[in-house]
Amino acid sequence: MARPKVEAGVKLRGAEKVARIPVKIIPTVDLPKKPDWIRVRIPVSPEVDRIKQLLRKHKLHSVCEEASCPNLGECFSGGTATFMIMGDICTRRCPFCDVGHGRPKALDADEPKSLAIAIADLRLKYVVITSVDRDDLRDGGAQHFADCIREIRLLSPGIQLETLVPDYRGRMDVALEITAAEPPDVFNHNLETVPRLYKAARPGSDYQWSLTLLQRFKQMVPHVPTKSGLMLGLGETDEEVIEVMKRMREHDIDMLTLGQYLQPSRNHLAVQRFVHPDTFAWFAEEGYKMGFKNVASGPLVRSSYHADEQAKIAKAML
């Protein structure tokens, strides 16, 4: 296959997206059949409908909808939502992720105010702000995160804000300096998988770099809980998961999420196993023994799953 030409603003998906990563992705013939314990209820409620209508009104897209999150109904009904800023084109090519790759367009200077107005209109209580990777920006997008936080707090003073940030590769010092000046209520960065699988699952990322990012933020802003998460089912062993959890605690990470990886398409990394709910429960027990303030562990758990409740518990224990 000829390498696709990457033009600004054009998203590469599927086979085109993973064409240049160091590990060849062989398309699966069929997507694996999900076990009985992975069942998603269609979210239906007046509050869910209200939030969806307002999202359309403000021309916003929540990660909850874009990723077809199984917990959308629970979160929307509870006044929680996750928004992606800085566009929908990522500079990385992670083959587990369904976000398009390419050369992003310039940042929208009006986005912080527009997002703040929309969140105030939605009457949300807890908001998670995440983003694509922006390796094209000198600060990795940290200032844009800070601008969004500031504008949202101006219009919604009582709101709780969690940021799920990229790894700020090569830009950690400047990014953390900006973040510490306008810190969120929870600082989240996902390790995603065990170090042995980084080359295949997170090309361009570094396991120790991500751990250091979380630890250094905690050292700079000790009163803000730190959080990270893993997807299970990419080929890791239970022993490797436990080892990563130990390393997280050594780097002062307060909160943990563990969920099942679900293959977005035939051109993404294949699911190697479906982890049983009992195993997820065991991981949670081990996590609390290690000293995590809160552990959300289950097949349908995602990074922002019950994020408001997690944050409340973690802050009470700091």
Swiss-Prot record:
Catalytic activity reported: [[Fe-S] cluster scaffold protein carrying a second [4Fe-4S](2+) cluster] + N(6)-octanoyl-L-lysyl-[protein] + 2 oxidized [2Fe-2S]-[ferredoxin] + 2 S-adenosyl-L-methionine + 4 H(+) = [[Fe-S] cluster scaffold protein] + N(6)-[(R)-dihydrolipoyl]-L-lysyl-[protein] + 4 Fe(3+) + 2 hydrogen sulfide + 2 5'-deoxyadenosine + 2 L-methionine + 2 reduced [2Fe-2S]-[ferredoxin]
CDD domains assigned to the protein according to its UniProt record, in alphabetical order: Radical_SAM
The keyword Metal-binding is annotated on this UniProt entry: yes
GO CC field: cytoplasm
GO MF annotations in UniProt: 4 iron, 4 sulfur cluster binding; lipoate synthase activity; metal ion binding
Requisite cofactors: [4Fe-4S] cluster
Enzyme Commission identifier(s): 2.8.1.8
Keywords, alphabetical: 4Fe-4S, Cytoplasm, Iron, Iron-sulfur, Metal-binding, S-adenosyl-L-methionine, Transferase
Residues covered by the Radical SAM core domain: 76-293
Keyword Transmembrane: no
Pathway(s) annotated for this protein in UniProt: Protein modification; protein lipoylation via endogenous pathway; protein N(6)-(lipoyl)lysine from octanoyl-[acyl-carrier-protein]: step 2/2
Co-factor binding comment: Binds 2 [4Fe-4S] clusters per subunit. One cluster is coordinated with 3 cysteines and an exchangeable S-adenosyl-L-methionine.
Localization annotation: Cytoplasm
SUPFAM superfamilies: Radical SAM enzymes
Residue positions binding [4Fe-4S] cluster 2: C90, C94, C97
Binding residues for [4Fe-4S] cluster 1: C64, C69, C75, S304
Family note: Belongs to the radical SAM superfamily. Lipoyl synthase family.
Protein name in UniProt: Lipoyl synthase
Species, as recorded: Pseudomonas syringae pv. tomato (strain ATCC BAA-871 / DC3000)
